[in-house]
């Protein structure tokens, strides 16, 4: 984590996942998908009928990276959605939302073949005590 002249902390985190491992998890334990992902995330991933687990894997990678940056929250409390321009955005619920107060999260997702990658950066104001 580093600070800038404007009085903010910046931190980054990335996570890589093997798509086949996520597919095996989903096929062996289908209820795990419902515990990890929101209904909106499940609908979005299942729209991609030929490669749904690439989409699940990249979202799971993002959830792991966000949780590591926040230090709190269940995976289901971290939702990966889309902004108005189609860009990935993080929506926080429950304890993750409390941990994320005042923090600006930016997200980049990528998947190619059997690898899913997520890069997350967070900016939060410095706390000044007198």
PLM region descriptions:
Residues 1-130:
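Core catalytic alpha/beta fold that binds nucleotide/phospho-ligands
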